[in-house]
Design a protein with these regions (language model features):
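Poly-acidic low-complexity segments
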Residues: 1-4, 68, 116, 129-131
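Extracytoplasmic thiol/disulfide redox context detector
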Residues: 2-104, 140-163, 183-197
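Thiol/selenol-based redox catalytic cores and closely related redox-interacting motifs
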Residues: 101-187
């Protein structure tokens, strides 16, 4: 499986692509020091159920995707998911966070405060480019939206690492699976097949 990672520093955005990993696509990635135990990973799904997310699809297989509007790898995963959602019976719940760049928070807020949040996410991804990243214009978030985004970011941090995209789902074996970084289309199909109905 090939995974692509996004690393961030206080100075901005740094990308590191094409890192080969020996773990299978369905494995929980190697936890970092001070990362949550498997029991805490199970609690992630409960927390995600109360997070501020935007759903696409109506299938029984629920996949959470924590993403930043300005994340290039999130954009790639978003594009890889589009042709698979309906035929594979998936519901993707997009959980926006805003921390990668100065405009990330405002763009994430624009998504959550839009009249049609899914249409806002689609516009952000359709107009994504490497000069300005996400295609939405940033807004000044309301205090309620800022709190919602802080809550979403706290869930991302509870995975043990603040890497986007992070995919989370319950497997057919009843385990909570956390995948950090991007997947290629073949691996994405395997993930969607592994999600419990």
């Amino acid at each position: 499986m090939r995974m692509r990672y996004l690393a961030t520093w206080a100075t901005g955005l740094t990308l590191c692509a094409g890192l080969p990993l020996s773990q299978p696509a369905l494995a929980v990635t190697v936890p970092a020091q001070n990362s949550p135990s498997a029991e805490n990973h199970a609690l992630l799904l409960q927390r995600l159920g109360h997070a501020h997310w935007v759903a696409q699809g109506k299938g029984p297989h629920v996949l959470y995707m924590i993403f930043d509007p300005n994340c290039p790898y999130c954009h790639v995963v978003f594009d890889e998911l589009q042709p698979l959602i309906k035929p594979m019976g998936a519901t993707v719940r997009y959980v926006p966070v805003g921390y990668l760049t100065e405009s990330s928070l405002g763009k994430a807020a624009a998504m959550l405060e839009a009249k049609d949040p899914l249409a806002a996410i689609m516009k952000n991804e359709r107009e994504f480019n490497m000069e300005h990243f996400g295609g939405l214009r940033e807004i000044l978030p309301s205090s309620a939206t800022e709190k919602a985004l802080e809550k979403n970011l706290a869930i991302l941090r509870a995975t043990g690492q603040s890497i986007v995209p992070t995919l989370i789902y319950r497997s057919r074996q009843g385990k909570t699976v956390v995948i950090r970084g991007g997947l290629d289309t073949r691996d994405m199909r395997s993930v969607l097949r592994d999600i419990a109905p």
